[in-house]
Amino acid sequence: MAPQTETRAGAGFKAGVKDYRLTYYTPDYIVKDTDILAAFRMTPQPGVPPEECGAAVAAESSTGTWTTVWTDGLTSLDRYKGRCYDIEPVPGEENQYIAYVAYPLDLFEEGSVTNLFTSIVGNVFGFKALRALRLEDLRIPAAYAKTFQGPPHGIQVERDKLNKYGRGLLGCTIKPKLGLSAKNYGRAVYECLRGGLDFTKDDENVNSQPFMRWRDRFLFVAEAIYKAQSETGEIKGHYLNATAGTCEEMLKRAVCAKELGVPIIMHDYLTGGFTANTSLSNYCRDHGLLLHIHRAMHAVIDRQRNHGIHFRVLAKALRMSGGDHLHSGTVVGKLEGEREVTLGFVDLMRDDYIEKDRSRGIYFTQDWVSLPGVMPVASGGIHVWHMPALVEIFGDDACLQFGGGTLGHPWGNAPGAAANRVALEACTQARNEGRDLAREGGDVIRAACKWSPELAAACEVWKEIKFEFETIDKL
């Protein structure tokens, strides 16, 4: 006869489906300095109270599950659980709320963006009670920020390495992005650097394809860098994309770049992953390489207003994982980026202490406790007429990257680079003299055209080019 089993009511624990509000919605909770804080934009399913949704987000991204389990009694849930401590409606939106969740520090592995994201933006985003969920911001406490090494070098060390001060840096993505042979690619790099740019760049999808294997590209680009340096007397660089299918292959490419003596390499941090990115950042720090970060795939994650992760969170994550440059949008070019929102996360990349400012989308005061800053990269559909706005918006600590705005010059690559260099220096000088670039920028560019035929030709080509589309990511 088979043994009989019996579950007795009241013995051990009370089984059943949980009402999350009873455990995880705690409006009286006093936030600790060591808590990781998250602001979620929630859209509940019809009929689901926002308090239940906020509590469910806190539960499913920390210690909770859908039912009571007997092993809850083996630990202290009050110590480890996430808590939804505040909920506020989103102005002007129907059935949308900002839920504030506090997570105790012990839930997360030290120095691991991968673990942080696995918890906070993991399975909870598929929760049925929610129609949509977006992580708008994170507050990284000083105690957790200090477990990360951050960027390999940071803005000031980069300037010292390059011996370039008092102006923004200039870059150019080599086009066409795919199809050039390694030798022709190196030729384009040389022409741009000789013309006056500080950097040129591999496009994000240039890895090691049949038309141009990575080692060939590295060798021809290194030759171009050294030739341009010898002719101009300036330190030059090219973002050699080390992104690869495995971490081992990625690091092999980084080692080759180091042996060639080039100053900077590149990684696609979202497609490559945070574990790979942190490993590459550590290598760059140990071996004196700067690390340029491209954000390919970001719009899949951050462009929808109601669901996903805002780019300011991805930018914070990159600062912790490690990178000296990060693409940040332009405000004025062809790619998405509203001015106040963009300036908000640019400050989160560069500054050491950033005050809460909801007008710029910053939900929490952030203290990076001396973690090195990341230089923003403005790239995408920009040309010489945009230079006054770019200098006014980004200031000096930014890399302004003109791809088509260099290579599309009617006289060739080197004149295109010269036009951008003249425009940058003219705008920087005008700003330093106290002129208002927002109002007088066009006059500054036109005046510079009188002594730079390269700039005059560029201004004529791009005088009618505009990208007039409504931005999606608004406050």
UniProtKB/Swiss-Prot annotation:
It catalyses: 2 (2R)-3-phosphoglycerate + 2 H(+) = D-ribulose 1,5-bisphosphate + CO2 + H2O; D-ribulose 1,5-bisphosphate + O2 = 2-phosphoglycolate + (2R)-3-phosphoglycerate + 2 H(+). Binds 1 Mg(2+) ion per subunit. GO terms for cellular component: chloroplast. InterPro entries: RuBisCO, RuBisCo_large_chain_AS, RuBisCO_lsu_C, RuBisCO_lsu_C_sf, RuBisCO_lsu_fd_N, RuBisCO_lsu_N_sf, RuBisCO_lsuI. It is found in: Plastid, Chloroplast. The modification N-acetylproline is found at residue 3. PROSITE patterns: RUBISCO_LARGE (PS00157). The record marks 334 as: Transition state stabilizer. The disulfide bond which can form in the large chain dimeric partners within the hexadecamer appears to be associated with oxidative stress and protein turnover. Keywords: Acetylation, Calvin cycle, Carbon dioxide fixation, Chloroplast, Disulfide bond, Lyase, Magnesium, Metal-binding, Methylation, Monooxygenase, Oxidoreductase, Photorespiration, Photosynthesis, Plastid. Residues 1-2 form a propeptide. RuBisCO catalyzes two reactions: the carboxylation of D-ribulose 1,5-bisphosphate, the primary event in carbon dioxide fixation, as well as the oxidative fragmentation of the pentose substrate in the photorespiration process. Both reactions occur simultaneously and in competition at the same active site. NCBIfam families: PRK04208.1. The basic functional RuBisCO is composed of a large chain homodimer in a 'head-to-tail' conformation. In form I RuBisCO this homodimer is arranged in a barrel-like tetramer with the small subunits forming a tetrameric 'cap' on each end of the 'barrel'. This is Ribulose bisphosphate carboxylase large chain. The gene is rbcL.
